[in-house]
Amino acid sequence: MSDRITKIFVGLAGVGALGFAALTIVKPEAFSDYGLDVNTPQARIVIRSLIGGFELALAGLMLLGGKLGLSLQQRAGLFSVTLLALGSVRILAATYEGLDVLFHQPLGEGALEIIVGLIAAALARRA
């Protein structure tokens, strides 16, 4: 049963990352909500390549990692480490910047990333 849950989780993680990669590559302007200036070609290239490319790589590992010899446990572990790092750094960066007004957004997103990362870690241990 846990293998099936882990397989579904890893698949959903891959599809989610793929969707986020597609959004980022097709419409980098979506990041203007975060205060990023996307008015120059250079900024859009950086957003597409760094964020979109990262998400595409993560999606590839989640969805095609089995073809590379990665087990479900290893893929869930990779996803866990990734989300735990992203969530922790997001919260620490917001704290460092002292974003009193906007703190709820990075705090909420960071907390969600940490929670999903912990679920992935639990599945990685069970698989």
Question: Which sequence ranges carry the predicted segments?
Answer:
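Membrane-embedded alpha-helical segments of multi-pass membrane proteins
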Residues: 51-53, 57, 107-115
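Membrane-water interface at the C-terminal end of transmembrane alpha helices
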Residues: 114-127
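Transmembrane alpha-helical segments of integral membrane proteins
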Residues: 86-96
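Core segments of alpha-helical transmembrane spans in multipass integral membrane proteins
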Residues: 43-64, 81-85
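Non-cytosolic membrane-interface motifs at loop->transmembrane helix junctions
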Residues: 38, 99-111
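Cytosolic juxtamembrane helix and N-cap/initiation of the first transmembrane helix
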Residues: 1-16
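Hydrophobic transmembrane helix segments
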Residues: 16-46
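Juxtamembrane helix-break-helix junctions at the cytosolic face
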Residues: 60-77
